[in-house]
Amino acid sequence: MRRVIQNFQLAIGQVKPFSAKGSLMDKIVEWRRLRRLFAINVGLKELLLPHIAARRMAVQSPRPHDEGGRRPYVDSLFDLRVPNEGAAGRRALRDDEMVNLITEFLGAGTGTVVACMEWALAHIVDKPGVQEKLRGEVDDGEVSRVVAGMPYLHAVVLETLRMHPPLPVIPRHVHADAVGVLVGGMSMPPPAGDFYVNFSVGDMGRDSKIWSEPDEFRPERFLAGGDGDGVGPLPGPKQIRMMPFGAGHRFCPGVGMAMVNMKCFLAALMREFEWALPIGTGAVDLTEMDSFFKVMKKPLSARVTRRRKSI
C-alpha cells in the first residue's frame, strides 16, 4: 500500500500544468508523464477495490461489528449521495470515485505539507533572525502549546502559505444555470454553457494593494498590529486576503490537519537542529517552479547541525 501511494505521489510531482503551447517534444514528454500517472491509477484501483468491496459486505452483514466508537472513513463514502447527472434524484458514489477520494485522503496531503515545509525552512535559513526568534519561542514552550500557544510559529506558517500556497491556482466549476457571475466587482450575464473560473491564489498573496512589501518574508505581519493581523488559513466573511486552502463550502477539509502537521514538524526541527547556509554559499535560491505543487526550482541545500543542548 505504501509503495503504491509513494509511486502515485512521485508521478504527481512530475506532472506539470499542461499547455497547448510548447514544442512537440514537450508535449510528448508530458504525455508520457500522464500515461505513467494513469497506469499508477490503475494499480490503485486494483489495490483498493477489493478492500472497498470487503468493507461493503461487512457493513451490510447482519453480524455486529464493533469499531471502538470510531467510524471508518470509507463508511461515510458509502452513505454519501451526489447529484445524478442527466437524471432525477441522487446516487451513490461509483467505485472509481471512491478510489479517487480514498487516494486523496491517504496521500494528497503529503506533497503539500512537504512543499510548505521546504519553503519555510528556506526562508528560515535565509533569515537567521527569524530562526532565532522562532527557536526562542519553541524552546520556552511545551509540546502541548505547539498548536495554539505559539503565535510566532503560527505566523511563520501563515507567511509561508501566503507567499507559497501549494496550489497557486484553484479552478472552480460554474454551472450554465448560474443566475449571474461576479468578476472584479462587475456582474456578468450567465454563460451559454458550463465553464471554469481559475482563482490565482499565488497572486492574491502577493498583491501590493493588500500586503506591504509582499515579496518580503516577514512573519511579524501576522502578529498583533501587522497588516495580516486577524488573517488565518481560511478567509473571513468580509474580505479575502489569502486563501491557500480555498474558500466557501469547497475549502480543503484537511486544513486543520495540515496546520497541525506543519507546526509540529517545524517546532521539532527548530528544537533539535541549527539551520544555516552551506559554507561558501551566498544566499538561498528562492526561485519557484510550477509542478503539480508550487515547489523550489533548486531544492533546498542547508547545513544542519544538531544542537548541543536539546530542549
Please identify what each model-predicted range represents.
Residues 40-117, 145, 150, 172, ...:
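Conserved cytochrome P450 catalytic core segment spanning the I/J/K helices
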Residues 112-131, 135-137, 256-273:
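Cytochrome P450 catalytic-core helices
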Residues 46, 143-186, 208:
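Conserved cytochrome P450 K-helix E-x-x-R motif and the immediately C-terminal K′/meander segment
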Residues 199-232:
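Conserved cytochrome P450 K-helix/beta-meander segment immediately N-terminal to the heme-binding cysteine loop
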Residues 2-54, 78, 301-308:
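Cytochrome P450 catalytic-domain helical core, especially the substrate-recognition surface
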Residues 191-194:
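Loop/turn positions that initiate beta-strands
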Residues 60-67, 143-151, 185-188, 250-256, ...:
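Conserved, non-catalytic sequence blocks in retroelement Pol enzymes and Pol-derived host proteins
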Residues 4-6, 139-142, 237-311:
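Cytochrome P450 proximal C-terminal region
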